[in-house]
């Protein structure tokens, strides 16, 4: 069964996936339309024997086939955007039928109503999901810490 692990929100985290997410967030906050209060996530996967990371956030536009929606893109929660990026890369570069996703880090705990159910359907049973703040109880604390991280 998927493991849900609460962890410290720190660039000095003992988990590489947490450090990677927060480092990416800090760099990307300088881009237009991207603020510290955009929920970020990273999916860790194995491809050709190496650990790789796919970043996602709630402000990213994910491409969709034309003619389905008004726009040819949608915005998803951070973890779903990261999953789409990881799966896209895996499909392009892997010939295995096994989903090589090993872990995910999401700043906010996945919401039970939607994201947690999707993660349970998509991620392998032995995947680890790390998060730092409870949703919705700690959203205000997350906003303060995210702004501190990004020095906004």
What do the PLM-derived regions correspond to, one by one?
Residues 95-98, 103-105, 113-152:
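Active-site or metal-binding loop neighborhoods of secreted/extracellular toxin and effector enzymes
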Residues 86-89, 122:
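Hydrophobic helix-cap positions at the C-terminus of alpha-helices
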Residues 48, 107-111:
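Short, internal active-site loops enriched in acidic
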Residues 1-80, 88-95:
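Glycine-rich short-loop/terminal segments
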């Amino acid at each position: 069964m998927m493991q849900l692990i609460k962890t410290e929100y720190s660039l000095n985290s003992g988990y590489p996936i947490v450090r990677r997410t927060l480092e990416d967030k800090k760099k990307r906050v300088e881009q237009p339309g991207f603020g510290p209060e955009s929920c970020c996530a990273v999916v860790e996967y194995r491809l050709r024997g190496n650990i790789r990371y796919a970043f996602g956030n709630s402000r990213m536009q994910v491409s969709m086939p034309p003619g389905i929606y008004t726009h040819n893109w949608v915005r998803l929660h951070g973890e779903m955007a990261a999953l789409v990026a990881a799966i896209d890369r895996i499909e392009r570069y892997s010939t295995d039928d096994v989903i090589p996703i090993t872990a995910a880090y999401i700043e906010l705990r996945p919401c039970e109503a939607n994201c947690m159910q999707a993660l349970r359907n998509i991620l392998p049973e032995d995947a680890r999901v790390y998060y730092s703040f409870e949703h919705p109880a700690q959203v205000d604390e997350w906003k303060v810490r995210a702004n501190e991280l990004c020095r906004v």
